[in-house]
Amino acid sequence: MATRTYFVGDLCYVLTRDEWDTVCLYDFDPEDNEGFLEPEKFSWTDYQAARPFEMMRTACGDGCYEGSDGKSYYVDSGSIGRIAVDCISDKEKLAETLEKGLGHLHEFDEEDSCGDDDGLLWFGELEIQTA
């Protein structure tokens, strides 16, 4: 199965203002945590063209949460998400965010799921307790 490199953390740190405005239009819940930065480009034959991402609210809002990988994940938007690195348009923002340790890169199989179980967020095998 193919793997991709994803940024995991508060997506507000790595997206442009316009992209973040698009993200904020979604009303995320544990059953529907996926969105698209360019929904007008969505196609079942080229799913990645729409630049998909996944995002979930933290149970306790902003702060710093520790992942099962022992790393800290900082939050300023009350949410943690993941997006494939090749879907991030502003690589400079990504580099700055990684340098500051606000979020981290992870390799996931494209089929790895993510979800929320009462504040326990998971991305593949990575778990982040936010409750």
What would you call each of these model-derived segments?
Residues 1-131:
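Intrinsically disordered, low-complexity acidic regions enriched in Pro/Ser/Thr
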